[in-house]
């Protein structure tokens, strides 16, 4: 929130007028300023929906803004109705309304483990009470503990749960840019599982304590992630696991690319 209601309202105005265009109360995921119309894919992305609802709830509570709280509750209802599903005895968060379940995906349901924004789920339960939220939290965490692909024992960005969990067809079988944020979401939610943190940190780390995207089949690094916004994720995990202080090099914020900049800000918050 940055304690800046005026800037938050500008972001919310853009979100409301440019992204909340679907009939189900969820946000379109792809907006391109270089083309007209700007929306190039009308499907939603459930991590984005969770983050929007979560931000609105925090802002509404912090600034006593009933409109934000009502919008947050409305979005939480839509998430629960359209994105939280039951399959194979689990409660799951599908990545989007279209394209991740049978009959369109015969190997569905498909999940993206990094879409579980664990810190947001209890807030959703306050907005729209349902025992399904707790089950979503618990089953997501149990899945993360069980998803150990390849020699580095890492989760895949995209996972098929039609039978035994496996990397989903049609996607790179990798611990990729999506999954890099998983340890950060876990730490921000206050989840205490040092064994899980250690496995993720060891699996995603290459030379010089640098995180990387990983080819799951071979265990070999694909892209080394030198930006401070990526490196800080490993540093946060080290702080949680062994009490190591964050290095000064990652405590200085100098934004570069959008995604690692957001990871760094969330790590420093």
Regions found by a protein language model. Name each.
Residues 1, 39-43, 57, 61-64, ...:
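Second-shell loop/turn segments in exported
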Residues 6, 19-22, 63, 86, ...:
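Amphipathic alpha-helical interaction segments
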Residues 10-17, 57-58, 70-78:
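Active-site-adjacent structural elements in enzyme catalytic domains
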Residues 19, 31, 50, 56-63, ...:
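Generic hydrophobic/packing signal
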Residues 46-47, 67-246, 251-261:
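Extended ligand-binding clefts on enzyme/binding-domain cores
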Residues 1-49, 252, 256-259:
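N-terminal carbohydrate-binding/catalytic regions of secreted carbohydrate-active enzymes
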Residues 1, 51-61, 119-126, 184-188, ...:
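Short glycine/serine- and small hydrophobic-enriched flexible loop segments
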Residues 4, 65-68:
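Residues in the short coil linking paired helices within alpha-helical repeat scaffolds
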